């Protein structure tokens, strides 16, 4: 379960790193054009040396960032390969970015139930209760009944309390006091651990559920508002330049803003992929449930 989540997150990181590398290269090219225009304007006396130096430094920073993103993409590929169990330098297979997966619409209580039914760590806690029940001589029906009513009420007068179901007494028979105390302690420990795991799973589902919908909304906003607006502005700037209404420098600046929008979209996409992987992990199922 953890490996499936980690592979999906590594895939999201790799796709994002590649997008960053491509966009950074385009940004470096734009900055170089701006620097070249600034140098020409300096020669014609339109700007000062300080302004030209600022443009040149921006171009150098963009080139440095592009190199860094190339290295980052290589590291992301190595991490992804490692999780798949193949050589870190193996690039013989190509990755085609898939569209973002939309999970079935489920309410939070439904996700809680899915997690409680599927998570192996909660099942392990249930098995610990079964083992403790067998040690004190309970039949399976009584163990299942105990699991059914087990709940947390906080600290009561008697310390640990089971939930608001029927009282279940531990049959002690002719055991001595030492065995009685040990059986009581083992059952209480197993029950407490079960509740701890169940509460932790509920919190994990709640957090990942919230993160998933926040990431989904952020990507929707980016694709419906940010990128279309920047794309339209770039197209209008190009037409205005062709008509002689604006300078080429203005067109380059608008195109740089479009690159910023594309970075935001790539980041939002990666965040949604990561959030999806974590939500799937929290509820304990993957492809089989989606196909159903």
Stretches with model-predicted labels:
Residues 48, 201, 208, 244-248:
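Alpha-helical heptad-repeat coiled-coil segments that mediate oligomerization/polymerization in large
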Residues 2-114, 208-211, 215, 219, ...:
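Periplasmic alpha-helical coiled-coil/stalk elements that build and connect Gram-negative outer-membrane
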Residues 264-292:
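Acidic, low-complexity, intrinsically disordered peripheral segments
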Residues 213-242:
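C-terminal hydrophobic structural anchor segments
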Residues 46, 91-130, 170, 184, ...:
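Bacterial Sec-pathway N-terminal export signals of envelope proteins
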């Amino acid at each position: 379960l953890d490996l499936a989540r980690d592979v999906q997150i590594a895939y999201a990181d790799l796709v994002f790193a590649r997008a960053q590398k491509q966009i950074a290269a385009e940004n470096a090219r734009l900055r170089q054009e701006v620097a070249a225009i600034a140098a020409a304007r300096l020669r014609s006396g339109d700007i000062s040396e300080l302004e030209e130096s600022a443009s040149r430094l921006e171009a150098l920073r963009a080139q440095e960032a592009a190199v860094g993103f190339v290295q980052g993409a290589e590291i992301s590929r190595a991490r992804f390969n490692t999780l798949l169990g193949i050589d870190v330098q193996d690039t013989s297979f190509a990755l085609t970015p898939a569209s973002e997966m939309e999970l079935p619409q489920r309410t939070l209580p439904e996700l809680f139930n899915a997690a409680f039914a599927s998570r192996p760590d909660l099942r392990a806690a249930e098995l610990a209760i079964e083992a403790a029940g067998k040690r004190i001589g309970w039949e399976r029906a009584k163990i299942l009944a105990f699991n059914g009513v087990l709940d947390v009420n906080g600290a009561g007068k008697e310390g640990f309390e089971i939930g608001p179901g029927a009282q279940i007494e531990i049959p002690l028979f002719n055991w001595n006091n030492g065995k009685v105390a040990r059986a009581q302690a083992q059952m209480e420990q197993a029950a407490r651990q079960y509740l701890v795991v169940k509460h932790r799973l509920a919190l994990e589902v709640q957090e990942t559920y919230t993160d998933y919908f926040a990431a989904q909304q952020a990507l929707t906003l980016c694709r419906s508002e940010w990128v279309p607006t920047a794309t339209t502005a770039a197209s209008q700037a190009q037409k205005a330049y062709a008509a002689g209404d604006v300078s080429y420098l203005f067109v380059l600046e608008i195109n740089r803003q479009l690159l910023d929008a594309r970075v935001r979209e790539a980041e939002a996409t990666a965040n949604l992929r990561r959030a999806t992987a974590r939500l799937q992990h929290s509820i304990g199922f993957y492809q089989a449930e989606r196909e159903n």
